[in-house]
Amino acid sequence: ALPIVFNKRRIVNYDSKYDIYNIGDDQGAIQIIDKMFEEEYLPEGIVAINDSLAIKMINELHNRGIHVPNDISIVGMDDIFVSKMVTPRLTTIHEPAEEMGKRSAKYLIDKIEGKSRNIVNITMQPTLVERNSVRKVHSKIRR
């Protein structure tokens, strides 16, 4: 998976100890939540690497009496079908996977047929799908 790049200074109270990589299963979701519960305060929100992990985390938090989005916000990535069927409905990042596949296949065919020798860099715009797993946070960012 590719990393998500953002300016950490724009995130209020960003704490790098929550940067956990290569976790994508039930046990990983529990490990992340266990680590959060060791602290005095829960983070304002979680951005999960995919919707499946976000949904697992919502369920685990619910089992511990933490309610999404009232107590913590969660955002997933990939906009899978089930993300709009869970409670709360998951806010997610929709990536144009079908269009990426079509463009990749066309590029590969052109390369095989000798029509292209150049390396192509294609940028596609993801979209935020706002549902119910995020609450508004009113905070001031220090400069």
Give each language-model segment a name.
Residues A1-R143:
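Bacterial carbohydrate/catabolite-sensing allosteric modules
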